[in-house]
Amino acid sequence: MGWFYYIARLVVKFILFSVTRWKVEGKANIPRQGPLLIVANHLNLADPPVVSVSLNRTAMFMAKEELFRSKFSNYFIRSFGAFPVHRGRLDRQALRQAENVLNEGMALVMFPESKRSPNAQLQAGLPGSALIAVHSCAPILPIGISGTEKMRGPFWILRRPRITVNIGRPFQLPTVGLRANRTELTGLTSLIMQHIAELLPVEFQGNYAKQGKTDAIEN
């Protein structure tokens, strides 16, 4: 990461401390080294930088391709450790890049819902995160974000919203082999989303509030 990354982190932290009530829980659960697939729910465009400054290690991000179209946003987002992914189809190049990040022992952040939740409820996850986890065998670190959905409109700063980043324990998916079929990937994706749901307030869990405890293997 270049100098801009570290300056941007300082700026984001300053903003969060100044205009929000930002709290990070479970920071001790973050492995300090080795490959790590970080998955979180998605409420606001601010979620990637909020997650980044909540971690105690450098992480790369997958971000929608549309954010890279202007020169300024392309420079800013890439400087913050992001690379593009095309939504709505299987982006093999992005998947390969994600696997390379993990194979090099780095951390990668994904938002399995693929887009921001329109009502703060946890939406169904897409299978990309499960596919990457299966191919890389990387441990998964779930994160539940609440409060960033209030960072909207011209006057949200005056409310100083309470933002909580709740970090769970890393876990491994059950072994299914590299050629997991669609049914297996759907089940693994559901496991990932359940881990995220358990870190959210009940009113944010959506359909996953009705599901039982996860049976993945905790590290």
Question: How does the language model describe each region?
Answer:
Residues M1, M62-A63, R87-G88, P118-N119, ...:
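A generic secondary-structure micro-motif detector
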Residues F4-I7, Q93-N219:
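Non-catalytic C-terminal accessory region of glycerolipid acyltransferases
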Residues Y5-L10, F17-S18, P31-R89, Q97:
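Catalytic core of membrane glycerolipid acyltransferases/transacylases, capturing the structured
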Residues F17-E25, R89, S146-E149:
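Short gly/ser/thr-rich secondary-structure transition/capping motifs
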Residues W22-V24, A82, V165:
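Generic structural signal for residues in well-ordered beta-strands
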Residues K23-Q33:
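Membrane-interface helix-loop junction between the first two transmembrane segments
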Residues A28, E65, H86, G144, ...:
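Residues at the C-termini of beta-strands that transition into short coil/loop
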